[in-house]
Swiss-Prot record:
Coiled coil: 641-691, 734-770
GO molecular function, one term: structural molecule activity
Annotated site residue numbers, Cleavage: R609, A610
Any GO BP annotation: symbiont entry into host cell
Function: The surface protein (SU) attaches the virus to the host cell by binding to its receptor. This interaction triggers the refolding of the transmembrane protein (TM) and is thought to activate its fusogenic potential by unmasking its fusion peptide. Fusion occurs at the host cell plasma membrane.
Signal peptide: none
Assembly and interaction partners: The mature envelope protein (Env) consists of a trimer of SU-TM heterodimers attached by non-covalent interactions or by a labile interchain disulfide bond.
Species for this entry: Feline immunodeficiency virus (strain San Diego) (FIV)
InterPro entries reported for this sequence: Envelope_glycop_lentivirus, GP41-like
Glycan attachment sites: 220, 258, 269, 274, 298, 330, 336, 342, 418, 422, 448, 469, 481, 499, 518, 531, 548, 551, 715, 719, 727, 735
Protein name, as recorded: Envelope glycoprotein gp150
Chain segments annotated as transmembrane: 784-804
Post-translational modification as stated in the protein's UniProt record: Specific enzymatic cleavages in vivo yield mature proteins. Envelope glycoproteins are synthesized as an inactive precursor that is N-glycosylated and processed likely by host cell furin or by a furin-like protease in the Golgi to yield the mature SU and TM proteins. The cleavage site between SU and TM requires the minimal sequence [KR]-X-[KR]-R.
Region listing for Fusion peptide, in residue ranges: 614-634
Amino acid sequence: MAEGFAANRQWIGPEEAEELLDFDKATQMNEEGPLNPGVNPFRVPAVTEADKQEYCKILQPRLQEIRNEIQEVKLEEGNAGKFRRARFLRYSDESILSLIHLFIGYCTYLVNRRRLGSLRHDINIEAPQEEQYSSREQGTTENIKYGRRCLIGTASLYLLLFIGVAIYLGTTNAQIVWRLPPLVVPVEESEIIFWDCWAPEEPACQDFLGAMIHLKASTNISIQEGPTLGNWAREIWGTLFKKATRHCRRNKIWKRWNETITGPVGCANNTCYNISVIIPDYQCYLDRVDTWLQGKVNISLCLTGGKMLYNRDTKQLSYCTDPLQIPLINYTFGPNQTCMWNTSQIQDPEIPKCGWWNQIAYYNSCRWESTNVKFYCQRTQSQPGTWIRTISSWRQKNRWEWRPDFESEKVKISLQCNSTHNLTFAMRSSGDYGEVMGAWIEFGCHRNKSRFHTEARFRIRCRWNVGDNTSLIDTCGKNLNVSGANPVDCTMYANKMYNCSLQNGFTMKVDDLIMHFNMTKAVEMYNIAGNWSCKSDLPQNWGYMNCNCTNGTSNDNKMACPEDKGILRNWYNPVAGLRQALEKYQVVKQPEYIVVPTEVMTYKYKQKRAAIHIMLALATVLSIAGAGTGATAIGMVTQYQQVLATHQEALDKITEALKINNLRLVTLEHQMLVIGLKVEAIEKFLYTAFAMQELGCNQNQFFCEIPKELWLRYNMTLNQTIWNHGNITLGEWYNQTKYLQQKFYEIIMDIEQNNVQGKQGLQKLQNWQDWMGWIGKIPQYLKGLLGGILGIGLGILLLILCLPTLVDCIRNCISKVLGYTVIAMPEIDDEEETVQMELRKNGRQCGMSEKEEE
């Protein structure tokens, strides 16, 4: 091939070949072409002279054609041909690139734009000529078109940025709403609380929320005075009684009668009460008397609805109270309670005062003192009878039963009891609602299991000097002439036997209904016949009231102060006692939001999602960040992230509390607890969900910005002096900005009730339904057919429009993957031997080994 070129044509060397290929690359550029099509192999870095000679041999036919083409071009003024077009495109594209770099900040590009790299060289022209371009040559190229779009887009971007900065600067004084702040505040007197009780293994009062008893958050908050849990004592007591006896009311009524109860002076001054007494079948009340009604079960009261309890003694937060013993009926002994004998301190007229009618004794400074007093009772069978061994199929074993000579209902169930201490009782001469006449006390007694008797507990009543005259008192002390339904002074001496009996019934007033509980059948179930004994099993912390007593100046026949300290019979009122036990628990809540200045956004933590489990953490570990008045507002914001990060720790504490309390609660009730708290958190959000979203605040945000027009309309101005750049406690800030919280509440209510956008949206939806209502009349199969046709047509249209771009994209991707770059496409004569396209793959010629190329 070299000999042919030498004979007929002038051989083209490496230098001339380099210039010819430069010209060829320039002429290949057209309106749609790239800026640098292909690579000049003679300008590849590190190319050697041997390589250049080899390239000349391979590309000699193409080089000859390029030289002939250049010689045929007539270079005249105003007609530069392809070369002029190439130069115009090159330098016009460079101008566009210069403008683009200018807008994005690369000003130095204009200074150094001639130093673009080793592959950029000016193409030498034999004769300089004036650069003149026709309108056709200066037509809009793709690069110029996209350059204009880039210019417009860049200008729009800068304009939007300017507008955004202006809006931001205009709202720098906006208000920020802090949702679910780590703070607890007292509830209002008018707020409604929802509570439940919890007692281990107690079906009548068992609630999953009671697992929070041992989960308390130690905190240094100091809360202002607010309503205590004792304010709801009457409601709680009534509900507790209904819970304790709810399954008993489903049984049949045993007896019913009407009765009139007289007051202290007969029926004068309308002091008589007409009551309807109902005696239910009492067998189902058997366990209730021994547990709930006598206060033998530890009961914890738990709050729901997102509210918590603050123990003012221990300075702790919890969902439930400490275990309490709440006797539901009047009982001689009670748990660790106190009584406000100064009646002026009790404002609730529904709570009976401590004291009775017609007394001159005035008790004050009462305190509860525990005692180790014990009662011992023994029973001796007073009627003849025999023990009979019977076979019971339902017990699967033999048993002994006592068969008296008379019916058991006619047998007097009498016992003899004594006390280990001298006890002076201030007693009433009659029981509640005319139940029992005479002075009496009552206590619980436990009987151990023996050969003939089962284990059982009884309620025993001891009386003195039972008489028949209801108008006069049966005295048992030194007060001989006390008349009417008055208290008496009686003393039960230590180690002295007194006649007592099993209590076979009592009367209780529940709401407006007075119920008499008959225990005769229940007592018979315990096999009370025969000889047996029992011992009182009062808890160690039970005792009596020790009071200072002062007599009045009246000389009437009324009860005076006891000569010795002692137990005060009938002092305990279940409502008053429950209220006294709950006075130390203050009902608090976590605010749903608090209004703070925009300044908090400058030092707040990185935004976190307010997920449901995060809300659970905030409600249980408020103290981690020092909730309340113990830390400044700026410190609370910076430590808020730590509170959110410890939600797993809160769940671990819940599990640990469940394990300590009862192992069986770890599975199901733990899940129920978490579900319950999640429901509370969801309800708290859904209550104002629509309004908060209208304000641009969703459930995933803790800090939400109020639109400026709203807080200006409602005159929500902050006192920056009080805020003091966050150097104020959250508790103080909340108390001094309650008006802001109220105004924000008004905003929410206005949005919820009078939402204009919501009404417009509904109207638009209705209009759209009117216009598009005809679609509903089209049969279902026609709808499917029409939808299929529209879908196919849309797909074909997209395919036609996007097919060229898709093919070009696939071609470019394949070239990139294979690593090929097209250098030249030489024209081959028909007579000449077929020559393959010269390609280079990664710097190597196709079809040649690496050794041959070297």
